[in-house]
Amino acid sequence: MDGVKCQFVNTNGITLHVAAAGREDGPLIVLLHGFPEFWYGWKNQIKPLVDAGYRVIAPDQRGYNLSDKPEGIDSYRIDTLRDDIIGLITQFTDEKAIVIGHDWGGAVAWHLASTRPEYLEKLIAINIPHPHVMKTVTPLYPPQWLKSSYIAYFQLPDIPEASLRENDYDTLDKAIGLSDRPALFTSEDVSRYKEAWKQPGALTAMLNWYRALRKGSLAEKPSYETVPYRMIWGMEDRFLSRKLAKETERHCPNGHLIFVDEASHWINHEKPAIVNQLILEYLKNQ
């Protein structure tokens, strides 16, 4: 991508591959991708944020694409994932950062905002609830059980890796809709994603984020008192119920929720103009 420079950054005992763009003296925005993406999932957001004067970094998170993939499920507990990002923030700025996260990246962002708020100025969470809402509401809300059933499957050893690798990563491709939506994803985009998934050890590392859940990754009850936030939510998300979004807004008093019609879990790809507008509007007006 034009204007994006990739580098390797040591943080929290590992090395992360980081895409960086924008003026070095601009306010720092950290973009955190979710499963099964990598830094390139923010391709529609980086330039508008840079054009608005921000310094933007988008890491491949631990276990993804070109970043380190430590062995063992315990290496993917949410406190560890959070500390990776704290290390990045402190290397790129002496000030507080703005963190924008989608899916699992949003879970890390929420956890950072709830447990180490001194590093954040603002949080924007895209189609991801506060982790403690996810943990406490899901067992009491049967419609979410089916939506989350894949998480139980991911706990199995080896079998999920084999199934995700079948037919040239067809399951992951279809989960995002890469090959089915040429208006959103070019053939180059599809190739980039599949190359990321093919990295040695990547599938196991990516799945270990989920496997760490059974080891108490979310055992801590982080505060609902977070930094100022905006939550953006595609109404047609087939993985996460809108109830989780509403419960997050109810419990977390320092922000607000915006629903977007005709958008799914992958809203940052489907409605980039709207997402970018909602991000920049919030950052400028609050």
Curated annotation (Swiss-Prot):
Q: Which family does it belong to?
A: Belongs to the AB hydrolase superfamily. Epoxide hydrolase family.
Q: What domain of life?
A: Bacteria
What keywords appear on the UniProt entry? Hydrolase
Q: Give a yes or no for keyword Hydrolase in this entry.
A: yes
What organism is recorded for this protein?
A: Bacillus subtilis (strain 168)
Q: List, from the UniProt record, the residues annotated as the active site of this protein.
A: 103, 210, 265
**Xref: PANTHER family:** EPOXIDE HYDROLASE (PTHR43329)
The EC number(s) attached to this protein equal: 3.-.-.-
Task: State the name under which the record lists this protein.
Answer: AB hydrolase superfamily protein YfhM
AB hydrolase-1 domain spans which residues?
Answer: 27-272
The UniProt entry, under InterPro entries, shows: AB_hydrolase_1, AB_hydrolase_fold, Epox_hydrolase-like
Gene3D superfamilies in the record, alphabetically? alpha/beta hydrolase
> GO molecular function: any one?
hydrolase activity
